[in-house]
Amino acid sequence: STWPAKDIFHEYALDFAKKVNDMTGGELRIEVLPAGAVVPAFGLLDAVSKGTLDGGHGVLAYHYGKNSALALWGSGPSFGMDANMLLSWHKYGGGKELLEELYKIVGANVKSYVYGPMPSQPLGWFKKPITKTEDMKGLKYRTVGISIDMFTAMGVSVNALPGGEIIPAMDRGLLDAAEFNNASSDRLLGFPDVAKVCMLQSFHQNAEQFEILFNGSVYNGMAPKLRSILDYAVEASSADMSWKAVDRYSKDYSEMQTKQNVKFYKTPDSILRNQLKVFDEVVAKKS
């Protein structure tokens, strides 16, 4: 996976693997390793495409540097869709076919499954509350995907890092602030140890989802019934992940507030409006 072993995202990858292993009765077995065990998190697509790994678990935003159109899958306001709507577009509205074409363009030999609707993500973790757009200018801030372009245009100094590298960077002062994803991941990675202010609501990634990759040759070599099991395991995992997220994230938000003295603030409307304005400008330049 592209996640540290302690991250709930790695747990989601393990959940998917268990479903496949159980349903195939051992005929197909998936072993899940954490980020860095074989390749760095941002190297997943290349590693799976080349066959260094048979498969992997991550997000499309980590491949954004390959083709900016990959931002359509949840990195940005997503044109008014939430994550479930975007998954509907992916399965029934032509998104799956578009993604296959994009992977052909970048030369990736992979079978991609997009699944797992994520809730809207916080603006992130800061040393003090953010009250206006100007407060973010010049901040050394972590994000990924087309959000890099959006925040850069807003005057933020952006550094794209995988999840496992964020807290050490904040601890050493290489970052002033950062976003990752959700209460459980953020808590497990250690955000409350380096910052006590979390700003909720943002449009930078309000409709993101996960991606499960398989090497194209490995996938095509599977028996049809095994490919069908993968199809249904992905859909079952998508639902299970969304239910687990509601339960775990809400508990961790509450416990960070009551046990770790984290203060949560709503992101000001002026920042949210500016995100939408700047995102439209970024998209216009890239179109």
Regions inferred by a protein language model and the residue ranges of each:
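Hinge/lid segment of periplasmic solute-binding proteins
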Residues: 91-108
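N-terminal secretory/targeting leader peptides
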Residues: 1-86, 104-287
